[in-house]
């Protein structure tokens, strides 16, 4: 088995000679065999091998015994061993995560700390060929992204180095045979024998049937995984270029231009969405599936100009005319604001703009457009106020004298619904709407009649 693993490491360039390697060791057959293999290769490749074990504190004394077992194993073989006891149940409750995801996050944080401490370039974990088969099958059945269908990667960047999986070349049966041959006595987790978990049901009932058809099943699935990963890498490069052409980044949010997006080939559309979501989630994708991607595509393609769908972890996708907004600001459309507008002042607004107010002795020469408004202090009730829209809002339009609903003004200007709820409206103390900045002026704007004093209002972006 060592020869097969050695060849796999060479073929995928998993390690460099003289490297420091953190080996994750739970005490089970896979990780114990992995540590033993690295021990066998240590002198040949001049490796510094550090064993890393985490007690997740799920099983009390039993977990502590596993930690002591790993320590003894390392002491007997003169392997540096780093251990940690982490209250994963407490972290799980505070973060609202599943047990396995919480344990994985805590474990990998510990690995990252050890990489810094020992200046290690690699973390090796014990996923094997059967894990690959189970993972791909589960994702095919449940639904996943194109990248997810490629299964477990052989090597990926991790904390300035790489996370590697040398055992993807071998099966569970080969690992168990290796343990017997080398006289290793790994600890066995009894939960692996129960059908309570989806992976266990695939392991006990589905994979054995497939292996009857092909005893080298894990090798076929690994070949499939590597081909899919290569295809995905190429398509991701195309998707990254396409994404830059159709996306507008807005702080934690992003907006997609629907027209240019729909001109892309369908395979690129899917991957552009996957890449966009990956960036929005901060590089840690949640449980996203092809179903979610399909829903976003339907939202972009359908004839209706508006709509909204919910994605995991509070992300919303909001269609408004020719834009699709991806936002975590789930409640922004429900929260209004109300500010008094002093003079002079610079009043920052929640939508990223500001209203600048000042006194002027002369009527401004340049106040064309809807980003300026001139107030005659004698003809309005002070103080001025800035607020968000309310049901039934109407204003008297400048030039016509007629009234119009603010809702109609927003619709005619094609302002997305999400932005309407944050759009500023300037009124006087009597509640008369004077100005919808950037969109419409009311009939209450001051005229150039030689008054001694005016209030000048300007609406501009905060970063301008």
UniProtKB/Swiss-Prot annotation:
Organism: Geobacillus kaustophilus (strain HTA426)
GO CC terms, sorted: cytoplasm
Its biological purpose: Ligates lysine onto the cytidine present at position 34 of the AUA codon-specific tRNA(Ile) that contains the anticodon CAU, in an ATP-dependent manner. Cytidine is converted to lysidine, thus changing the amino acid specificity of the tRNA from methionine to isoleucine.
Lineage of producing organism: Bacteria, Bacillati, Bacillota, Bacilli, Bacillales
Protein name in the entry: tRNA(Ile)-lysidine synthase
Enzymatic class: ligase
Subcellular location: Cytoplasm
UniProt EC number: 6.3.4.19
Keywords attached to this entry: ATP-binding, Cytoplasm, Ligase, Nucleotide-binding, tRNA processing
Domain comment (free text): The N-terminal region contains the highly conserved SGGXDS motif, predicted to be a P-loop motif involved in ATP binding.
Catalytic activity: cytidine(34) in tRNA(Ile2) + L-lysine + ATP = lysidine(34) in tRNA(Ile2) + AMP + diphosphate + H(+)
UniProt-listed GO biological process terms: tRNA modification
Residues reported to bind ATP: 26-31
Principal place of residence: cytoplasm
Family membership noted in the UniProt record: Belongs to the tRNA(Ile)-lysidine synthase family.
InterPro entries in alphabetical order: Lysidine-tRNA-synth_C, Rossmann-like_a/b/a_fold, TilS/TtcA_N, tRNA_Ile_lys_synt, tRNA_Ile_lys_synt_N, tRNA_Ile_lys_synt_subst-bd
Superkingdom, taxonomy of origin: Bacteria
GO-annotated molecular function: ATP binding; tRNA(Ile)-lysidine synthase activity
